[in-house]
Amino acid sequence: MALNLGKSVVDFLTAHPEEKFSARQIAEWLVATFPAECSAKKASSQTLETDADLLQQLVAEIGSQRPRLQKKHANLKTTEGRPRKYYVSEKSDIAEVAAAENVGVVAPVGKDEAKLGEHGLYPLLSSYLWAEFGVYSKRIDEKRSSNKRGPNGNRWLYPDLVGMEDLGADWHQEVKDCVNQYSDKRTKLWSFEVKLLINRSNVRECFFQSVSNSSWSNFGYLVAAEIEGQDTLKELRMLFAAHGIGLIKLDVENPSESQVLIPARERGEIDWDTANRLATENKDFLEYVKLVKQFYQTGEARPADWDVPKTED
């Protein structure tokens, strides 16, 4: 009997509701569950010479059948990013966001699993930014704000993380000194809004929150541990074209494998009026400004002053 791949995939995911699987994981299950059908598929093909070839073919077919399967099964959903994950959920988009915010996202710890809330994502993002871009990051805690303007006066004002990129980290000392004398820029300032889950129900709210609290910087990013649905990513690309806020998919299992799905559009100048508002209202942001000033004064950034992951000597 020939392998009914589409039905088998849906049956497998339905038997494991809310659990997310990559196409490769599903393909491995197919090979283990339907050995005779998979062997027949391999034998009937002139191109599938090895088991690895068969597995890769199943992965490709799962991906190619995804649009058709999602049209037929409304509860079949996918995440965006690498690798794409497949899952079945009866929850609405709004309910999925609420569940993520209440429970968190799954991150493996050894063989066990732990649930990460939004605050648990910050050190993972800091680690990625440092390893990938050499960006010194700093957490901005909105609880350290004055709130002089009332309960909603500072709504969407503060980013979750801010960062400083040392443009001359690899420059010769003479070049650094020359730039200082020339009074040219030595840094790019970054700003980040972090979310556990972005889907169709909250994509515009999340994006415009990022526009509101990160447009002061050279590079503003919306960061998400999970992005559900191709329509969500399409919407974000459309919004980027108008506003320039980028998108980072944060890999909670392996932060170094996180991806910039949409590069932010650089702003040539800092919006110092907004930066002043942030520094006036929030002690963490004021400390960030002081650290940037200190860097320009000394030419050095001390990792101990920033949320930079410690390295072993």
Q: Predicted regions: what is each one?
A:
Residues 104-172:
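Acidic-basic catalytic patches of nuclease active cores, encompassing PD-(D/E)XK
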Residues 125, 161-173, 183-199:
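Conserved catalytic cores of phosphodiester-cleaving nucleases, focusing on short active-site segments
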Residues 198-203, 216-254:
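Nucleic-acid nuclease catalytic cores
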